Amino acid sequence: MSKRATRHAIEFAHKRILAKNPNGEAFKERYGDSPPGFLVISPSRTCNLHCKGCYDGTEEAPSILSFSTFDRILNEASDLWGMSFVVISGGEPFMYKSDGKNLLDMVEAHPDLYFLVYTNGTQIDRETAERMGELGNITPAISVEGKVKTTEDRRGEGVFGKVMNAFENLRAAGVPFGLSMTATRHNCDELLSDEVVKFYFEEQGAMYAWIFQYMPIGTNYDLSLMITPQQRLNLQRRMWHVIEEKKVFLMDFWNSGTTVHGCLAAGRQAGYFYINWNGDVTPCVFVPYAGANIHEIYKNGGTIMDLMEVDFFKEIRNWQHSYGYKTKPAQTKNLIMPCVHRDHIDVLFPLIKEHKAKPLNQEAAQALTDPKYYEGLHSYDEACAKVLDPVWEKEYLKVNGQGTRIELPAEERPLPETSH
């Protein structure tokens, strides 16, 4: 890594792990809990690819988050929450332009924040990579779907070669980079195969990967693309095997629920809110229903703190606490089924309707009125529970002499079985 990248990585780790957060203490006095840990912001929907099953969905006239509003959001989150980490998504973030400025101008304007950027990688030329290396407080997570053919089947012909060019440019500039991987029913077994792990992490130098199990939202959503319950368990087993054997940093937003005590949505402590290009604020990137709009909040003289008072978000946080966040083991439900959307549709949809959360796009509106969508996810939840509940009970909990469930220490948990 470049010297700047190394310095910023060390400073970020110190802030997140060792340093006290005075802003967080004030927040805790007011709300009874620590503040959200980060934001996910998609400042623009503009993208040069048309990936199959993109989560963005269809909009007639998407906007762009102005540079000034984008900047204000980051300043407020830093000042009021003590936030030191921000995630950027899209669209394609490196195509963002506003008031003659781009994403890297925003990164430069906030040297005290560390930026994780989800990108398709096609815009990372040598000049862009060199500037990222000079800034030091940014790391791109580049989207791949596995091998060459699998990646191009979803993302388009020629994309894999551009990703390889991006890797080369980032290595030359000393920029730490990782991967963003979407697991579907078709590529799930390939995604963390020995061949794929060796290629990306050992040969190309990727330092981490974030795994997203396909969510049936956005463009041409398709429930049949979701990984099966057994594939989901196999992926969890394989993920922990790769972590232990290859020492690779991997996180799966569903299968890693045990490491973060469940769902992170709706501004939970150490969790996040999602803000898109229209200023709409949703609980999660994968819950396309807005409980607020940042432009309206600012118009009414508010700040980002007002998000904590939105009833839709409050109700989700209440559910998180009742489900397993900061609960005793006897009251903790299955944290490898943590998602309020895909794993607990019977919880989410009534809340959306009760609080009149606004669908972000045509597909989100359609899902609310499509009985097959609800029934399909509900059936999926039940099928997953049959496979994953016994794993939760056997591998993460045990019963003591008084018949009380207690959580197994990590060193006592059975090693995951692997089939790869």
Predicted regions and their residues:
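Flexible glycine/acidic-rich beta-alpha junction loops that bind and position SAM and/or redox cofactors
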Residues: 186-188, 208-229, 251-262, 288-291, ...
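Short, small/polar residue-rich loop motifs at catalytic or cofactor-binding pockets
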Residues: 264-269
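Conserved alpha-helical substructure of the radical SAM core
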Residues: 1-130, 135
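C-terminal accessory region of radical SAM enzymes
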Residues: 230-259, 286-346
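Radical SAM/AdoMet-radical enzyme domain recognition
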Residues: 71-88, 96-212
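C-terminal non-catalytic accessory extensions
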Residues: 362-420
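Iron-sulfur (Fe-S) cluster-binding segments and ferredoxin-like electron-carrier domains
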Residues: 56-65, 288-293, 343-361
